[in-house]
Amino acid sequence: MYTYYISVGSNMGDKKGYIHSAFQSLQQHEAVSKVISSTLVETEPWGYTEQDTFVNGMWFCESTLDPHQMLGLIQCLEKEAGRERLIHWGPRTLDLDIILAYDSQGAMLSLNDAKLVVPHPYFWDRSFVLKPLYELLPTFTYKDMTINERLAQLSE
């Protein structure tokens, strides 16, 4: 069994509707259990900033799917929401990223291949990822720092 923290975002159309629909699909998947969502919050765009605000959050789930299989599943959810990858960091109906993954013993996984990088390479630099992650995993530390300490650094 694997444990995942998946960031979720949308900034096109019915933002919360896309997120809710994908959440329900994830809950109903036979290989996924114990799906929990953080609070959804409105945030400013990151990277490419000439676009609408986002609704962002974080999902926790447990699954028998390995990280590459989970990536395939969340990419299917994005596709069902009409996701098109036209501009890097550009507008999207639904954006799902595996932020953290843990194995059945609770060890954090580290993957870096052509299809998947876990932990997500930018998660530690994005407050819109860290705030909802803190809601679901308040004791998390990375690079000898708590989420709150990192958020304080990012706000300086």
PLM regions: where:
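Short, charge-patterned binding micro-sites
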Residues: I36-E62
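Short low-complexity stretches enriched in small and charged residues
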Residues: G9-I19, E50-M58, E84-R85
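A structural signal for short, well-ordered beta-strand segments
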Residues: V8, S37, G57-W59, L96-L100
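Flexible, gly/pro- and Lys/Arg-enriched active-site loops
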Residues: W46-F54, L65-L71, C76-E156
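Short, structured patches in soluble enzyme cores that scaffold and shape functional sites
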Residues: V8-S10, S63, Y134
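A broad, low-specificity signal for short, low-complexity segments enriched in glycine/proline
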Residues: K16-Q24, M58-S63, H88, R92
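N-terminal beta1-alpha1 ligand-phosphate binding loop
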Residues: M1-V32, S37-E44
